[in-house]
From Swiss-Prot:
GO terms for cellular component: plasma membrane. Residues 21-301 form the ABC transmembrane type-1 domain. GO terms for molecular function: ABC-type beta-glucan transporter activity; ABC-type oligopeptide transporter activity; ATP binding; ATP hydrolysis activity. It is a multi-pass membrane protein. It comes from Rhizobium meliloti (strain 1021). This is Beta-(1-->2)glucan export ATP-binding/permease protein NdvA. Its EC number is 7.5.2.3. SUPFAM superfamilies: ABC transporter transmembrane region, P-loop containing nucleoside triphosphate hydrolases. In NdvA the ATP-binding domain (NBD) and the transmembrane domain (TMD) are fused. InterPro entries: AAA+_ATPase, ABC1_TM_dom, ABC1_TM_sf, ABC_transporter-like_ATP-bd, ABC_transporter-like_CS, NdvA, P-loop_NTPase, Type_1_exporter. Keywords: ATP-binding, Cell inner membrane, Cell membrane, Membrane, Nucleotide-binding, Sugar transport, Translocase, Transmembrane, Transmembrane helix, Transport. It catalyses: [(1->2)-beta-D-glucosyl](n)(in) + ATP + H2O = [(1->2)-beta-D-glucosyl](n)(out) + ADP + phosphate + H(+).
Length: 585
């Protein structure tokens, strides 16, 4: 994207509140006109003093300019602050909504902290540029536009010096921008690496402590920051050189105005006051050009951040729901996978040609070695991932044709890692159903055998659980997650290793709740503890993304296949059981 395209697109994010922005623009034009009038007035005062005229009215006018300038500046700043802060808040909310709705595969590909970093930096950048533009640079730009014609009206010869000075500034900035374009993009890349490292280490602080990684992680960060600085120094050097060259250009122009102005005064072609006004113009021009250069540097530095953000936005927009997506309603719970295949991006992992059909109300156990694709399969059912091939039908409706929202309303999931948010226990359970009463929340907790430990806590249901529920034990987290699914009361239930962290006694209590919940619901159970899948109507044994065995629990346990071998290995089935069943067959 060219610089122009980047900022044309950036403006689309800012083109709101047109009336308020218009008022700021008008105020800035007035402010700029006063800024130009001041050196002229100053020159007139000097002339009046030297010819011993009355300067009081001009001094009064000058004071009036000062008061008006101050009041207008405060009002413009206040309005600009409000506009820019408001825009930052809305941009963050809008972009957050889109990003958070992206499939998990997108997040794992993009990197959650990377996306977060891009989003926050883009919000800050757009906000900062917008604020400075409205507060300061708009007036600067208008002042520069008014200054040159005013100067030309006074004296063409001295004005040409100002034009050459302006052109020198622009040329120097252009050269520096083209020389540092790649360097600046590299700086952005290094910023991402630094941020990802910091966020990865801090979010895994227990591992960092337990494995004595504090120094090592700090060393690693130092390495990344060094790389960042190595990329950043040459860019900064170029801009420092530009400042030096600008200073030389300003000094030369100032001297030229003085020398030529003196000659013109001596020849009687120009008054002293006019030369003084021109020196004021030159000073104004230098100050404003410096401000514009600083703004141009910011615009240039922000370019890579904004491009990164636009890429993020584009990848998000591509995945929005089609307008004609239907609503999945009145689900009974028949689930069919028809030749489903899915690959993770940049990975050989996924699932291949999975087909099965489960009747409404049945329990389906998905078993198999770790990494076999069990979680991926249930994620596909919820359209966390989109299959590359095949169809998934619920009650005969292809789930690709309905909104994700309606699909997910029909499914309650207990995640492998419980998935608790840093909120109170009550709020975590209520994620199942927002409008549930406290009594309903408590009943769900009771059914999930969670009420005892919750009520033992000082703040009961108001106890805040910490990030990812880290202030609860693994078993407590799972019971809160089960209570949440119970409260949701959806026709399809997914239990992904839902009871793996529970002791035998608690698991037995929770099992009663789950058994009650399973009734009249299609339930998918993923479990390594095979005792929990005994009641399954259908067992799907997966390995390396494929279904290798499928059938009823008794049918598979009596065959001499991998499921039976696994049952024997876990002591659920003895060799004697198998021999008996084979003989009977
Ligand atoms: N986002 C991802 N990108 C690339 N590969 C992935 C991703 N998520 C999972 N995988 C890989 O896909 C395979 C299946 O993962 P999945 O989580 O479905 O296994 P699973 O059978 O549920 O394992 P477990 O019993 O250990 O939970 C694994 O090899 C895993 O490494």
């Amino acid at each position: 994207m060219s610089l122009f395209q980047v900022y044309a697109r950036a403006l689309q994010y800012l083109a709101v509140h047109k009336f308020r922005v218009g008022a700021i623009v008008i105020a800035n034009i007035v402010l700029a006109a006063i800024t130009i009038a001041e050196p002229i007035l100053f020159g007139r005062i000097i002339d009046a003093i030297s010819s011993q005229k009355d300067v009081a009215p001009m001094l009064l006018l000058w004071a009036g300019f000062g008061v008006f300038n101050t009041i207008a500046f405060v009002l413009v700043s206040r309005e600009a602050d409000r506009l820019a802060h408001g825009r930052r808040a809305s941009l963050l909310t809008e972009a957050f909504g889109r990003i958070v709705s992206m499939p998990l595969s997108w997040h794992s590909q993009r990197g959650t902290s990377n996306a977060l970093h891009t989003l926050l930096r883009a919000c800050e950048t757009l906000f900062g540029l917008w604020l400075e533009f409205m507060r300061q640079h708009l007036a600067t730009a208008v002042a520069l536009m008014l200054l040159i014609p005013t100067a030309f009206a006074m004296d063409v010869r001295l004005s040409l010096i100002l034009v050459v000075l302006g052109a020198a500034y622009v040329m120097i900035s252009k050269v520096v921008m083209s020389r540092t374009k790649e360097g600046q993009a590299a700086v952005e890349g290094h910023y991402h690496t630094v941020f990802s490292h910091v966020s990865d280490s801090i979010s895994n602080v227990s591992v960092v402590h337990s494995y004595n990684r504090i120094e090592a992680e700090t060393r690693e960060l130092k390495k990344f920051t060094q790389r960042l600085l190595s990329a950043q120094y040459p860019v900064l050097d170029w801009w420092a050189l530009a400042s030096g060259l600008n200073r030389i250009a300003s000094t030369i122009s100032m001297m030229a105005i003085l020398v030529i102005g003196t000659v013109l005064v001596q020849r009687g072609e120009l008054g002293v006051g006019e030369v003084i006004a021109f020196i004021g113009f030159a000073n104004l021009l230098i100050g404003r050009l410096d401000q514009m250069k600083a703004f141009a540097t910011q615009i240039f530095e922000a370019r890579a951040k904004l491009e990164d953000f636009f890429q993020l936005e584009d990848s998000v927009q591509d995945r929005e729901e089609p307008a004609d997506a239907g609503e999945l309603k009145g689900v009974v719970g028949e689930v069919e996978f028809r030749d489903i295949s899915f690959d993770f991006a940049n990975s050989a992992q996924g699932v291949r040609n999975v087909s099965f059909k489960a009747k409404a109300g049945q329990t389906i156990a998905i078993v198999g070695p770790t990494g076999a694709g069990k979680t991926t399969l249930v994620n596909l059912l919820q359209r966390v991932h989109e299959p590359k091939h095949g169809q998934i039908l619920i009650d005969g409706v292809d789930i690709a044709t309905v909104t994700r929202k309606s699909l997910r309303r029909s499914i309650a999931t207990v995640f492998q890692d419980a998935g608790l948010m840093n909120r109170s226990i009550g709020e975590n359970i209520r994620l199942g159903r927002e409008d549930a009463s406290l009594d309903e929340v408590m009943a769900a907790a009771e059914a999930a055998a969670a009420s005892d430990f919750i009520e033992d806590r000082l703040n009961g249901y108001d106890t805040v659980v910490g990030e990812r529920g880290n202030r609860l034990s693994g078993g407590e987290r799972q019971r809160v997650a089960i209570a949440r699914a119970i409260l949701k009361n959806a026709p399809i239930l997914v239990l992904d290793e839902a009871t793996s962290a529970l002791d035998v006694e608690t698991e037995a209590r929770v099992k009663d709740a789950i058994d009650a919940l399973r009734k009249d619901r299609t339930t998918f159970i993923i479990a390594h503890r095979l005792s929990t899948v005994r009641e399954a109507d259908l067992v799907i044994f997966m390995d390396q993304g494929r279904v290798v065995e499928m059938g009823g629990f008794h049918e598979l346990s009596q065959s001499n296949g991998r499921f039976a071998a696994l049952l024997r290995a876990s002591g659920i089935l003895t060799d004697e059981d198998v021999r008996k069943s084979l003989t009977a067959a």
